[in-house]
Amino acid sequence: MGGGVAVCRNPRRPAVELGCKGITANAILAGAIRTDRWDPLTPEQVQERRDRYPAGKESSSEEIAAAVRFLCSDEARTITGVELPVDSGIGVCLLKYNKDWIANDPYNVKYWERK
């Protein structure tokens, strides 16, 4: 399972309920992916964002797809009920940066002003 927090943030219950039918249930926790929303950013702003990631760059859609393919493969047939972060490591350090990121990133400021 995947597609966002609204779909299934916790795959454990479906894993328990569907496991007896041979169905696995997992969640991909995708991080930032380069999209056209990044187009207005300057190269310096892009680099500043990338510097926050332990992997040094945002994840690609191909990397997200590779994780999905793996979880759908025979090699992962006994992996169920997991949340797999594919986020360039930002999830492990997000709390440290979250306050400053929201306060200083123009996109985030506009997003939170709408809420």
Predicted regions and their residues:
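A glycine/serine/threonine-rich, flexible loop-to-helix segment
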Residues: C20, A30-Y53, L94-K115
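A conserved structural motif in NAD(P)-dependent oxidoreductases
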Residues: Y53-I64, E75
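A short hydrophobic alpha-helix cap/turn motif
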Residues: V16-C20, I33, S59, C72
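Short-chain dehydrogenase/reductase
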Residues: R77-C93
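Conserved SDR Rossmann-fold cofactor-binding beta-strand/turn motif
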Residues: T24-R34, C72, P85-D87
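Short, small/polar-rich loop/turn modules that mediate ligand/substrate recognition or access, typified
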Residues: G19, T24, I79-G81
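Conserved catalytic helix of short-chain dehydrogenase/reductases
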Residues: M1-E17, F70
